[in-house]
């Protein structure tokens, strides 16, 4: 444990020299660039980034670099993404975003606004079954739906309700996820900003999705040999991100998580020049924003036996300057927590 705590201290307090910091920033800039289209699965962005990461590990002096392939199912949005409300065009990622499980949808639809002050689920169902609103898009505050989960769940089924989809206003900054993108559901959900019109008449959409079945991606595993090989330390970070929302919009993911990926490459470069006591492994996971698929696959198919790992550091979203840094330990690692607080 003494050696473990010394390693934690070294990792947490090491001062990067100017050359290391410049290299770190260069990696973040590279992985956030348009050539990787948000490191998602449309246009093979994640795999292009993974190939670059593998080359970079080799370039900085890693003794071994391995690509560990696995497959996943994932929904993507690389095509048309046009939304207009009463003729006014909305900008993807700015005025609206989608749920990751959305199907494609094309057409012009009436808007049905839920009466949240006098909410009556049965009346809502009756309205949506009427000739006036049959096939409409339903507009409601997202948090309101949480209070009436069962009532709104029915709107997601074509069998139970004829609405074309849902438009949810949200007070929070608009978010785009991948965690539930392994399936495509029956109806689309759009998230829009709170300033979405309160009395618009129609919404015209042309949204294309592309579902990738058994898409092959890979983890990148680099090893820097130490003096001892009976156990090891592991640094991990995921390199995939959210990818594209239409043809022109992509999420660069500098913070989440080019920052963590750049850190483990920088650490690999350090240990390649300064031979450690134990073997060091640096794992860049893919499929992480898509429900932890890369790390799950590694646990099931470890390159090095999990029992030989003395300690694992996972670096995620480390590029902000928030004075409150968040660190999470499992029960086994709690002995190091007091030292972390002290640092």
Predicted regions and their residues:
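Bacterial Sec-dependent N-terminal signal peptides
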Residues: 1-22
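Noncatalytic luminal/extracellular "stalk/propeptide" segments of secretory-pathway proteins
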Residues: 37-137, 141-142, 146
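Loop/turn elements at helix/coil->beta-strand transitions in domains of secreted/extracellular proteins
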Residues: 26, 133-137, 161-165, 229-233, ...
